[in-house]
Swiss-Prot record:
InterPro entries: Tobamovirus_resist_UPF0261, UPF0261, UPF0261_C, UPF0261_N. It comes from the Bacteria. Transmembrane segments: none annotated. Belongs to the UPF0261 family. This is UPF0261 protein BMEII0128. It comes from Brucella melitensis biotype 1 (strain ATCC 23456 / CCUG 17765 / NCTC 10094 / 16M).
Length: 418
């Protein structure tokens, strides 16, 4: 396993007409840290006092327009949206040609808006850093944040350099260069399996499945399905980074259908199927919606069973009608898959608190989901029921048997056993 080149190419993105002092300082820090800054100017009205690697005209051209047309668009929102489109297309092309080892962008709200788009299209594990006056604020929708994005508050910045600003910018530049130098790209030595889960207090199948899959010569990447983890899982699936997936925690679909902010976006449970990756699916935690524990419970859930996991996140069970709706959404997503799908239904419960005597146990509501799934899936999906809880050994053994059968049939590539 090797890291990037000793002089990683770092895209430095900002409006050079208004932030030239800061951007030139950042370029200098990147060079002193051993990186190669690639300046991308996203100015609109003015010009930077330096020659960028990619000018605002290059950015506009990448959006299929001109700087003058962008100026004539009528307002700063439309203008920056067009520059974001162009900068995103430009960086995407550079990345596809292997010319991007990392990115760092600087901005207030306009620059951050643009930078979020660029970070979102870069592959997972390419270091991404945004220095922003609105870092980690409520202005940033979770669905726009790349799953491996790093941010730092541009404290004391916005209008020229000062000691605080220099400290912030130098930290950020050192971080992105260090990450680009030391990052280990995923190994191709063994085929990679994707798996979703919640913490082991809720779901436990990975304790059995991970070592068994590793014995068979696979690497296993497990994603914490609390919004950002699902986004990372979907990003790798979209890149065709898995040979198969065990998508056993699909609660993020329930979250999305219930309006929770703990979302992984509208494409949850879609990218693996679209990429032709074989999927083994189970309804882990599909009975719950996650909400921030520090916010008031929404009115529609105030009479539902509630479990506070910690001070950050709480789980609330959804009604039988909501579970039926989620089942229909899940079935529709899976039916579009371009590779085999096996859906395994554990009839004894779908998370640890869904047991007799536990606070979130609602067998009638679980039955509503199971009934809807039975009727919603078509013949393109293999449908199996296990008379056991999702955390029982019988469930994990059934899932492993499906996987082994697929390997024997050539549906999944064989593992690399040393």
């Amino acid at each position: 396993m090797t890291a990037h080149t000793n002089s990683p190419r770092i895209m430095v993105i900002g409006t050079g007409d208004t932030k030239s002092d800061e951007l030139l300082f950042m370029a200098d820090v990147i060079e002193r840290a051993g990186g190669s800054p690639v300046m991308i100017d996203v100015s609109i009205l003015g010009n930077p006092p330096y020659e960028p690697a990619y000018s605002k005209h290059d950015v506009a051209e990448a959006a299929g327009t001109t700087v003058q047309a962008i100026i004539d668009s009528g307002d700063e929102h439309s203008a920056m949206a067009l520059m974001a489109e162009g900068a995103t297309a430009l960086v995407r092309g550079l990345s596809q040609r292997g010319q991007v080892d990392g990115m760092i962008a600087l901005g207030g709200s306009l620059g951050t808006d643009l930078a979020l788009d660029i970070a979102a299209i870069l592959p997972l594990v390419v270091p991404k850093f945004i220095v922003s006056t609105i870092a980690y604020s409520h202005l940033l929708p979770p669905e726009r944040i790349a799953p491996d994005l790093m941010m730092i508050l541009w404290a004391g910045g916005l209008y020229g350099l000062n000691p605080i600003c220099r400290s912030v910018l130098s930290q950020a530049c050192g971080a992105v260069v260090g990450a680009a130098k030391l990052v280990e790209k995923p190994s191709a030595e063994k085929p990679l399996i994707g798996m979703t889960h919640l913490g082991s207090s809720c779901l436990k199948y990975m304790r059995f499945l991970k070592p068994e899959l590793e014995k068979r010569g696979y690497d296993v990447a497990i994603f914490h399905a609390t919004g950002m983890g699902g986004r990372a899982y979907e990003a790798v699936a979209a890149q065709k980074g898995f040979v198969a997936v065990f998508d056993f925690c699909i609660q993020e679909v329930t979250n999305a259908e219930s309006g929770s902010v703990v979302t992984s976006g509208p494409d949850r449970m879609e990218n693996a199927g679209r990429a032709g990756i074989p999927q083994i699916i189970a309804p882990g935690a599909v009975d719950m919606v996650d909400m921030p524990a520090w916010q008031n419970v929404p009115e529609q859930f105030r009479d539902r069973p509630y479990h506070a996991h910690n001070r950050l996140i709480a789980s609330i069970t959804v009604s039988p009608e909501q579970r039926r709706a989620v089942a229909r959404v899940v079935a529709a997503k899976l039916e579009r898959a371009a590779a085999p799908v096996a859906f395994i239904l554990p009839t004894g419960g779908v998370q640890e608190w869904d047991r007799n005597g536990e606070p979130l146990h609602e067998p009638e509501a679980l039955g509503a989901f199971l009934d809807e799934m039975r009727g919603a899936v078509s013949g393109t999906i293999t449908f199996e029921e296990v008379d056991a809880h999702i955390n029982a050994p019988e469930f994990a053994s059934r899932a492993l048997a499906v996987f082994d059968r697929w390997v024997a049939e050539g549906i999944v590539v064989k593992g690399n056993v040393a």
